[in-house]
Amino acid sequence: MTSNEENPVGVQTLKPNNDAKRVFEMRKIPSSNVMRVEYTKQSKYRTCVCPSALHFAEECPSNDVLFSVGAHRNMLCVAKAFDQTKPRGMQRGNRRNNVAKVMTLNELMPKDDSNDRKKAKTSKDRKVEKSSRGRASSSRSRGRGGFSRNGRDRRETDSQDEYSEDNSYKSEEESTEDETAPLTKKDMLKMMSMFQSGAKSKRRPR
């Protein structure tokens, strides 16, 4: 490390012990978690952007890797692939997903796609609302077939609804739509006793 006058604020220059020609500068880009690493060697300039760079740059013990960012599982390393003479050096010792990318500053800048996202969200919400409305209306218009909320067979109640008048039938449907509370135990017992008595009276030979 040299004096603070030569290096600007927020810049850290690292020189590995193996090769003094390689100079690295690591800068913290404001209002982001991205560390920008500038690599200069023989008038070649590369910029490495590591999105998960949360620690300062450290010299990697491996010979193929110049330095690594962080000491965690998802380690991003800058290797000799920046020389373009050994392109396989980047892949050595790293997994496919953990290879550092070479990006420009234009790619770093956040895109103003907030309006597009809002439009997409509204269109998706509208589609979901339409589909939910269609499903609800179709299930209501199908009638009273199948099983009800409390698990009892609706076909049992159809026999009772046939003898009742249309007005009472409509009032029952409206009351069930308005009041979503399930039936009480007393109502259930009454209905069960009515069905049992009706079945027994039909089966008894006279």
Curated annotation (Swiss-Prot):
Task: Tell where it localizes.
Answer: Host cytoplasm
Question: Which stretches does the entry tag as region Disordered?
Answer: 87-206
Any one GO molecular-function label of the UniProt entry: RNA binding
Its GO CC terms?
A: host cell cytoplasm
Q: What is its main location?
A: host cell
Keywords for the protein's UniProt record, in alphabetical order: Host cytoplasm, RNA-binding
Q: Report if keyword Cytoplasm is assigned.
A: no
- Cystine pairings recorded for this chain: none
What's the superkingdom here? Viruses
Q: Name one Pfam family in it.
A: Pns11_12
Compositional bias segments (type: Basic and acidic residues) = 109-132
**What is the protein's known function?**
Constituent of viral factories. Binds to ssRNA and dsRNA.
Family according to the record? Belongs to the phytoreovirus RNA-binding protein family.
This protein's name = RNA-binding protein
